Curated annotation (Swiss-Prot):
InterPro entries: Apolipo_AcylTrfase, C-N_Hydrolase, C-N_Hydrolase_sf, LNT_N. This is Apolipoprotein N-acyltransferase. PROSITE patterns: CN_HYDROLASE. It comes from Bordetella bronchiseptica (strain ATCC BAA-588 / NCTC 13252 / RB50). Pathway: Protein modification; lipoprotein biosynthesis (N-acyl transfer). The gene is lnt. GO terms for molecular function: N-acyltransferase activity. Keywords: Acyltransferase, Cell inner membrane, Cell membrane, Membrane, Transferase, Transmembrane, Transmembrane helix. It holds the Pfam family CN_hydrolase. The active site is at E292 (proton acceptor), K366, C416 (nucleophile). The chain crosses the membrane at residues 31-51, 65-85, 89-109, 144-164, 181-201, 215-235. Catalyzes the phospholipid dependent N-acylation of the N-terminal cysteine of apolipoprotein, the last step in lipoprotein maturation.
């Protein structure tokens, strides 16, 4: 019997809940192996597609899609409980309620997608045998377009939270070859099409596979094959010599990181790791990169001796240092103050006064801030006050900021979950209006210690891998507790440190130049394709329907 077939009232909700839970496992290779993520994602989503398309009404389709997504988000984002309860100090029932409330909101987007697709694709019209192939192809394309459109809306509504976009389940699948052209939203469209095509193979009326309904599945296989071929193409070319980097993972326990009594301990650990001499045969680093908020207080709250110690590290190693630090600055001629979550770069020649005032030449200010963690949305001060989260209410950085020029390479930094928003990374890779060339390397600094050693770390690494595929640029990630890694321009993890362990990762990273179609146009091609499919679906929906 099909998931949408007759049976006890509890059967279909149970199947959708189980499929949603399985779907949550497909976004990072933990606990499932990497090769299984894409098949699990497509099969699980096919259950939701079939159930929603066979629903008796659009309202019932919304409920079925919402239930599936509710279980997917609740399990896939369980690590938010760790942040709110273990480190935010929120009572366990309230932390659990927070995860469920967010999941319920996020699940509205897939639910609405299922409702829209069901409204555009009634289950039993135009069902004559000659028309079945056309109908299943149309239905699969329409369902996929609705799903991908709502994935995109989830990425932009209320600052956006596109975590667990289904495209990330396909980093190691043939569909990844489409990333340089269509980005994650285009991959989501193709993955949703594959799921809907699989759902179309199952004919609920007879319980048998109907060969007439295999056209959409055949198209899905062709798209996967084309993705594999596209994946063989090189979209960028090397520029300059490889850059030697040292990535530092301090592994400072989150419960201790912002404790004033333990501030010196954390600083000393990072100083020691940054000061380690190169191993035998290992070249000296051109740049040492430390994670987000290595200094857990504003830079002007530290004595000059702390900055003297860091300058001494740069002097002894004959290198430059980039570190995440919260900055308190007062722009020239301004009466107000700015507070930013930033990365600063310096070397042995940098005056201490520049470091204490936050006026170093190399600086990046985070532009996409975390709601409740880095700024307070209107009406939610009460919620933030319940959490023990320091360093809130930051100011935003500019959309395009200068790269860090190091040894012939240009590094574009991003902080925390900014690498989740692919279009916002693109201005730094493109040539500036002043003719300044775009970045050749991307670097993410983050502190995922808020989430413990959970799926969040592996999911974040998958997100970074897809950004490199979209842009054909390498990316390095320096994190507090993991996963510190180097990813090449094809999305392959070249080196990584185990999570939950202090250490340094010496890597040689080859900078790349040249723009992929996605790096040039961002989400526009994918959105245009989604829009055309929706327009075609709406136009077909107005035609007279056969009984």
């Amino acid at each position: 019997m099909s998931p949408a077939g007759k049976g006890p009232a509890w059967r279909q909700p149970a199947i959708l809940a189980a499929a949603g839970a399985a779907h949550a496992l497909s976004f990072a290779p933990d606990p499932l192996p990497a090769w299984s993520l894409a098949p699990v994602q497509v099969i699980a989503l096919a259950v939701a597609a079939h159930a929603s398309l066979q629903a008796p009404s659009a309202r019932r389709a919304l409920a079925r899609g919402w239930l599936f997504a509710m279980f997917s988000f609740s399990l896939g984002l369980y690590w938010l409980y760790v942040s709110m309860h273990d480190y935010g100090g929120l009572a366990a029932p309230l932390a659990a309620a927070g995860v469920l409330a967010l999941s319920a909101f996020l699940a509205l987007f897939p639910g609405l997608a299922c409702a829209a697709a069901r409204w555009l694709c009634p289950p039993h019209w135009d069902a004559s045998p000659p028309a079945r192939a056309r109908r299943t192809l149309y239905t699969a394309a329409t369902w996929a377009a609705c799903w991908a459109a709502l994935e995109w809306l989830r990425a932009v509504v209320l600052t956006g939270f596109p975590w667990l976009n289904i495209g990330y389940a396909h980093v190691d699948s043939p569909l990844a070859g489409w990333a340089p052209l269509l980005g994650v939203h285009g991959m989501a469209l193709l993955a949703a099409f594959a799921a809907a095509a699989l759902a179309g193979l199952w004919q609920s009326a007879s319980g048998r596979i109907d060969s007439r309904q295999a056209l959409a599945a055949g198209v899905a296989l062709l798209l996967a094959g084309a993705g594999w071929l596209l994946g063989q193409f090189s979209w960028s070319r090397p520029e300059g010599k490889p850059l030697h980097l040292r990535l530092v993972q301090g592994n400072v326990e989150q419960s201790q990181k912002f404790d004033p009594a333990l501030l010196e301990t954390g600083l000393r650990r990072h100083l020691e790791l940054a000061s380690l001499p190169p191993r035998p045969g290992e070249p000296k680093p051109d740049l040492i990169i430390l994670p987000e908020t290595v200094l857990p207080v504003f830079q002007d709250q530290l004595p000059a001796s702390v900055w003297d110690a860091w300058i001494e590290v740069a002097r002894r190693a004959d290198t430059r240092i980039a570190m995440g630090v919260p900055l308190h600055t007062q722009p020239d001629g301004a009466t107000g103050h700015r507070y930013t979550n930033s990365v600063i770069g310096f070397d042995a020649s940098t005056p201490v006064e520049q470091l204490r005032t936050g006026t170093t030449a190399m600086r990046y200010d985070k532009q996409h801030l975390v709601p409740w963690g880095e700024y307070v949305p209107p009406g939610f001060r009460w919620f933030v006050d319940m959490l023990d989260i320091p360093l809130g209410d930051f100011d935003r950085g500019a959309a395009r900021q200068p790269s860090f020029d190091i040894a012939g390479q240009r590094i574009a930094f991003n902080i925390c979950y900014e690498d989740l928003f692919g279009p916002e990374l693109l201005p730094a890779l493109q040539d500036g209006p002043d003719g300044r060339p775009g970045a050749t390397i991307m670097a993410n600094v983050s502190n995922l210690g808020w989430f413990g050693n959970t799926w969040a770390l592996r999911q974040h690494l998958q997100i970074g891998r897809l950004r490199t595929m979209e842009t054909a640029r390498p990316m390095v990630a320096a994190t507090n507790t993991g996963i510190t890694a180097a990813i090449d321009a094809r999305g392959r993890v070249a080196a990584a440190l185990p999570a939950g362990r202090a250490g340094v990762l010496p890597v040689a990273v080859q900078g790349m130049t040249g723009l992929t179609p996605y790096a040039r146009f961002g989400d526009k091609p994918a959105l245009a394709l989604i829009g055309l499919l929706l327009i075609a679906a709406a136009a077909r929906g107005r035609r007279p329907r056969q009984p």
